[in-house]
Design a protein with these regions (language model features):
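Structural detector for internal amphipathic alpha-helices that build alpha-solenoid repeat scaffolds
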Residues: 1-9, 29-42, 62-82, 90, ...
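Amphipathic alpha-helical scaffolding segments comprising HEAT/armadillo-like alpha-solenoid repeats
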Residues: 7-22, 41-59, 81-93, 112-130, ...
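Short inter-helical turns and helix N-cap capping residues of alpha-solenoid HEAT/ARM repeat scaffolds
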Residues: 24-25, 57-58, 64-65, 95-96, ...
Length: 271
């Protein structure tokens, strides 16, 4: 069950969510795990129960998936407690692709480099030539994004081959990571420009993904391209906000960099 499939309400209470997370009703347990993450409930009891839920065996689909584990893994990243790191690293071995994906994303959010060796091990999964099989191997895009955010420069040799990956979103995740890991501005700009070119892709969902990537890395050179992308203004504004946030620390308040002024003007035009 994804966030888009769940009601966006705050009718549950912390105490009831904790009870529901331990009850026999699997639907209530899944919802409670989602709710705790959605509303950033950073209660130690909640975190402990969510960590326990990563080992749940009761909620399993006919296809072998673990919906409760998925929601628990996603929630733990949002709660920001690094006590979950070890359990999330173990979850990277789960047979459920989406649990592994959620665990990688949450480890990226938690920012603990202890997960880098395991992520690198997953990245070394042999790549086959069939796209259909690649979809079921590893969540390569989530792994690459995590390595970039975590600053794992030692993984650059393993990331580089993914720039030629047959799945576009994986290829662009590699470019995003290389931008973050490149110390030379010209080299970083090269990878940022790969993402700019991707904004003209015919696939709307892919354009949305790349907008998110550019916002995450805050590439100033992409500002105009982001503004002109054929996508929802709301997503372009979020992406430009990411670019702006990278510019703000570069000036002494109340002054702004020329880049920040430029981005703010583009944002105004989208409002």
């Amino acid at each position: 069950m994804s966030e888009s499939e769940l009601p966006d309400d705050n009718q549950l209470t912390l105490e009831q969510a904790l009870i529901n997370l331990q009850c026999e009703d699997l639907g209530l347990r899944i919802y409670a795990a989602w709710w705790l993450g959605r509303f950033r409930v950073k209660d130690p009891r909640a975190i402990a129960l969510l960590i326990n839920a990563l080992d749940d065996e009761a909620d399993r689909t006919d296809a072998g998936g673990y919906p409760l584990r998925r929601n628990a893994a996603r929630a733990l990243g949002k709660l920001g407690d690094r006590s979950a790191v070890s359990a999330l690293i173990r979850s990277l071995d789960c047979k459920d692709f989406y649990v592994r994906e959620a665990a990688a994303q949450s480890l990226e959010m938690l920012g603990d480099i202890a997960c880098v060796p395991k992520l690198l091990e997953m990245l070394n999964t042999p790549i086959t030539s069939e796209i259909s099989s690649l979809e079921s191997d590893q969540p390569f895009d989530a792994i690459l994004e995590a390595l970039g955010t975590l600053g794992a420069v030692e993984t650059i040799p393993q990331i580089l081959p993914f720039l030629e990956h047959p799945i576009p979103r994986v290829k662009y995740a590699a470019a995003r990571a290389m931008y973050q890991l490149s110390s030379d501005p010209k080299t970083a700009a090269h990878y940022g420009d790969i993402l700019i070119k991707a904004l003209s892709n015919n696939d709307l969902q892919l354009r949305r993904t790349v907008l998110s990537d550019l916002g995450a890395i805050g590439y100033l050179g992409a500002a105009e391209a982001i503004s002109n992308t054929m996508a929802e203004n709301s997503l372009k504004l979020i992406s430009l906000k990411g670019v702006l946030e990278k510019q703000i620390p570069l000036a002494t308040p109340p002054d702004l960099t020329a880049g920040a002024v430029r981005v703010m003007a583009l944002m105004d035009d989208l409002l």
